[in-house]
Amino acid sequence: MEVLLKKIGSLVFNFYKVILISASLLTILTTALIFRIDLKTDILDALPSKKPAIDVFVDFLNDFGSIDNLVIVLKSKDKKIDDYFELAESLGKKLKESAFIEYVDYNTLQTNREVMLRNFPLFLDKDSLDALRNRLTKEGIEKQIRQNKKQLLSPLSTPLDSEFIFRDPLNLRSIVLSSMSKQGANRIGIKQGYYISKDNCMLLLFVKPAGSSRDIKFVKGFEREIESILEAAKKEYGENPDLQMGLSGPYAFAMEAHTTIQKDVIINAITSIMLVFLLFQFVYKKRFLVLVIAGATLLTALSWTLGLAYLIFGSLNMASSVVTAMLMGLGIDYIIHIFNRCESEFIQSGDMRYSLDTPLAKTAPAVVTGAVTTSAAFFSIVTTSFKGLYQLGIIAGIGVLACLVSTLFVMTSLVVLMERQKKGLLFNAGGQRFGIDRISRIIKNYPRPIIFAGMFLLLASCIGLYDIRFDNNPESIGPKTSHVLLLEKEIAEHFGKQKNPLFITVTAENRERLMEQYGTLEADIDRWHDMGIIAGHSSLRLFLPPRDRQREAIDTLGEIRDALTLTGMENIFQKTLRENGFIVDKQYAAYMKGIRNALEIQQPLGLEALENNNDKKIRYFYNSEKLKAAAYLYPKDGKWDTSSIMLLQKETEGLGKGFMLTGTSIMFASLKTSIIRESIIASAIAFIIISCIIYLQFRAVKRVFLVLMPLFAGVTITLGFMGLTGMQFNYINIGAVTLLFGIGVDYGVYIFHDYLEKKQNTPEMVVQHAGKAVIMCALTTIAGFGSLATMQFRGIASMGVVITIGVVACLICALFFLPVLIHYLERKT
């Protein structure tokens, strides 16, 4: 390796201008590619693509599109939300006019008209059918018309009241809405068709965007459109301290997540760069030009890395988005070692050629070994099926090698260029000592206590290993604070805790069979509700009641027809209108005809009725192309327990072929074993590869043991600390273990390589010479990864915390335990 590195030194010394021009051209090209990279924030982009549980869930999303909906929330502090119906109407109309929106649902009376109006008795439960029977009697008609008159004469009457009374003078809508409000277990109130909470605090408008939440370009335009519409509505309605507007729903979360991660990535990149360079300058007190060279070297490597990432993947996901902070912390290590040695040699000799050859021949082998082991460990993560960790491993592995190449060629070329411009322009002695002398004295005076302390620490850590836990709750990787989720909790409090649903789907070979299966499913859903397994549900029955319920309604309609004279009912209606001062409008004839036709229904509706219905919400429950139906099952208090999920899975299996149960809770539960197993395999592969590389470098098993001791002990201490403190793994930070194998091995490599080169037989002298650089490498790594702890998404933040703990543990082991072990073991030989 030394021969090759010396040749690199000669190449750099003789062709530094060519190298810099070539590197600059390549950097310009890759920088242009960086601006094309998309940042995907959907958690599905970080999960495996070929897992049955995920495939079923993704199929559900593709078939029913339930994830792509937005909820606009109007809130009234004074519980006067019905004062804002006109605002809701104005908002609804503006939303309908937008090209970004497929449809809007804010008033149930404005949707599902064709089927519902013609066949409304089929949608009524038993109590509502009895109410219909009473409403159509002579007494019922007279009572309702008198109530209409009283309402219109009231000083609180609104234009909307007049319109509703004109359209439906018998107020049959109240009967229909009462029946519909009983379909779920939530506390939704439907007043004049609007979706409001029963405490009169909230009103909801449901929006279906025209594009997917995974289409980043569309999401940006859609977000601007929604903001514009809401602002226009506020200005039109005027400022009102009682009124608040907000966004909720999966689509709102996707918009918020994209904005949050994008902002976090930019801030984190800037923060990590500043921390690394401030730390570098504080410790080494280099001239400003050295900072420029280090910055150019790192940014060149980062540009190459992200350019290749675009060519390979085209985008970054939630996990791989942190690669900038990682490379800032790791890449500076190679610069520190090579430049410091170059500076030291130049100060002693004054010869630039010698000062370049010596660090490349003597120091660079350890740097190359460290970089290769680090990248190999990162590449080991590709053995996992989780796309987030897989992508992170490849990009980070490429990035480490890019930092190495950039250091060996770009940094050294810049050093030669600057020194040829003016000798002594870069190099100066000085810098912080980090208390290295004190550490050396401790190692010299207390070797045995250090050994015993290390053994005790490892023993305590091993005890903690038994308490390591994995959190498979999606919230463990979600945002720390989210306005969307906070509003979702408010909605749950006001409307009932209908969130975190499981989805059950049924498919059949034809419509007739699907209708039968749908009826079976509805009966079982009612049974599950009675058993207390579920708290509520939403299903196709909102648009098409099961056939057996329709038949029950048809039988009741027969009884109503027998009890009423339809012609007499119309005469009573017209007479009562005149007696109360109403004009008998021509449209009332059509109105009464519609009622008469509805009462004369003799056959139940089939799925064909849905396919002729223009209500877009039906797609959430019925896919006519694939002949699939879906129902949404809601848990008690918004959270599923393991026993309920297992019982529902067993019940679903008992329903037979064609029924499938899915949901995020099921999906993540099924992935837990997989991610743990694959992470252990990746870590084992990383350890084996690292061991082989270390052996090729040092050519002795005992030396391999010594070099790897700080890594093994540091990882054990980290895991034990997590177990003892209750810190849990999740789907993102579990990748930190494999990353730590690649990061922590470097410290042992640097210490032992320095020992071999200097032939220092005392452990304190090893620390005296190499300790400062090792501490600085650890601190810059902490600056890079530690900055992740400030990010909003818990998964990424916790990964930064785990790696920071691991780096500190590996550093302590390398600085204290390794020199003492070197002293004892090498002295014996």
Language model features with spans:
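Transmembrane alpha-helices and their membrane-interface boundaries in multi-pass membrane transporters
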Residues: 311, 328-343, 363-364, 368-383, ...
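Juxtamembrane segments of multi-pass membrane proteins
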Residues: 447-572
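Pore- and gate-forming transmembrane helices of large, multi-pass membrane proteins
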Residues: 347-384, 708, 760-791, 811
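Solvent-exposed, non-transmembrane loop/terminal regulatory segments of multi-pass membrane proteins
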Residues: 34-78, 181-194, 440-441, 449, ...
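Extracytoplasmic
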Residues: 157-282, 286, 519, 589-690
